[in-house]
Amino acid sequence: MIFVNNRSVSYFSYLKGCLASLLLVATAAIAQDPNATQQLEQEPGVVAKPSILTKRFESDRTALANAFAITQYQRNYILPFSHVTNPNSLGNEALTSDNVDNNEAKFQLSIKLPLYTQEDSVEGLYFGFTLTSFWQLYNSEVSKPFRETNYQPEVFYQWNTDIRLLGFDFNAIQLGFNHMSNGQSGIRSRSWNRVMLSTLFSDEDDVYYLKTWYRIPEDAKVDENDTSGDDNPDINHYYGRMEIGYGTRFDNWGVLIQLRNNLEWDKNRGSVGITFSYPISPRYEAVLEYFNGYGDSLIDYNRKQERIGVGVQLALF
């Protein structure tokens, strides 16, 4: 629950109100100018350039024509060095609060495969998989273990909206099911299931996304060592209930900002992530990544963290 003017309202009522307000603003804009979606293209001598995501989807469409190809989903990167302020040692039995290292490597692999797509289009049903690992690479005292690994298999449908409004291409809407787990058991187990809804839009220089989710409820654990039941009943209060992202490029530099929030006024929590990138080849980029907040990993979901790391990623956009 969240509280507004001392009145308790459900998260869904609040979210519905926000979406309704956005719809009213868009409707009013169209009502004032029924040709708003076509003004840019109709100006004499001006040719509308394709937006970032329009070009990205076209590249995906070309790649998916190859039956042996897979495509990038979320970011793919490796940070050989990162420093984190408050790492949780619980994820590996060899680690303790005394020997866990604040310096570690972090990497993420993320792919998607089409299960069904419309002819000559990227609209369709997809399977996605994202793996994120936190490796105590510099911790020779305990044989350099993996402190935590998170797995995210998901299935989602992507609709290509192809709507141009107020200078933006509203490129796609995605709806799907996401399972996130650290693959552990007992007191180390962390997992949750969500129904995810995302919208993606962009212009020539910028890309935006808005993502929200509904957590599928689970029964409470009778005992913390039970193999069934909710591993983390309060995860929404820390990890959040929605995420907003913005990316842009200037003078070859790329910037990606990601914000998560729990939408609770009384105990507001969330996170901010900022990634700076610079191309070192057409395929690879050097990156500097900064994170502050909750949900850096599942084992750390309720611990406030600050992390900074350097590494390399596959070009994102």
Regions found by a protein language model. Name each.
Residues M1-R61, F317:
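Cleavable N-terminal export/targeting peptides
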Residues D33-E141, P145, T149-P153:
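Outer-membrane beta-barrel initiation region
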Residues T85-A94, D101, Y116-D251, L259, ...:
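Outer-membrane pore/translocation modules
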Residues E243-E289, Y294, L316:
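Long, repeat-rich segments with strong aromatic
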Residues S297-N302:
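Short proline/glycine-enriched turn/loop segments at secondary-structure junctions
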Residues K304-F317:
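Outer-membrane beta-barrel "beta-signal"
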